[in-house]
């Protein structure tokens, strides 16, 4: 499609003009049939945005052997494997620009449930029940169970920085905001900005990622595009 758009004005208008054109509708019908029957993509305003989200979804080739990506293309299912922590990265990482995505658990959290970012070098599986995301210098994570921020195997304080921060509720969508210009990672809950969690991120390609420990739990990640200011 991209190559056609370069040589044909009609295709260019279809791809870069109307984001709900028949081209994008057709791609959604063909690639996202399962997801379109649910509310997974309800916060995406156009068919083009839905297709883009699928391009940025979890990678079936870059996750622990103990998880699989469901037919909807956006949800990770962790198999009930004892003494293992399992993660997944998305298909596409970011080295520039500003990006936002939503993550939510659709099952129990267990003792550790971490959302954040990772380089391509960060491991996506380890023994035991640990905070895999944030366990080394290649990943940064927020543990939704105890509200700790994790990087390089250390706790970098609690988050959000307020008294009696509410615990995560299953099904609650958390918005993650990665700013590769300012080198920061921030979070929102229910459109409430919770603050910047990490600063001084490296000039590297960083991927949205999660890690989970509870058997048969499921995690969904949906890429939203450029975050809205304000």
Swiss-Prot record:
GO MF terms held by the record: ubiquitin-like ligase-substrate adaptor activity
GO cellular component terms listed in the entry, alphabetical order: cell projection; extracellular region; glutamatergic synapse; nucleus; postsynaptic cytosol; postsynaptic density; postsynaptic membrane; presynapse
What's one Pfam family the UniProt record gives for this protein?
SPRY
Protein family membership: Belongs to the FBXO45/Fsn family.
Q: What does this protein do?
A: Component of E3 ubiquitin ligase complex consisting of FBXO45, MYCBP2 and SKP1. Functions in substrate recognition but plays also an important role in assembly of the complex. Required for normal neuromuscular synaptogenesis, axon pathfinding and neuronal migration. Regulates neuron migration during brain development through interaction with N-cadherin/CDH2 after secretion via a non-classical mechanism. Plays a role in the regulation of neurotransmission at mature neurons. May control synaptic activity by controlling UNC13A via ubiquitin dependent pathway.
How this chain assembles, per its entry, is: Forms a complex with MYCBP2 and SKP1. Interacts with HEY1; leading to FBXO45 nuclear translocation. Interacts (via SPRY domain) with CDH2.
Q: Which PANTHER family match?
A: F-BOX_SPRY DOMAIN-CONTAINING PROTEIN 1, SPRY DOMAIN CONTAINING SOCS BOX PROTEIN
Question: What is the name of this protein?
Answer: F-box/SPRY domain-containing protein 1
- What organism is this sequence from? Rattus norvegicus
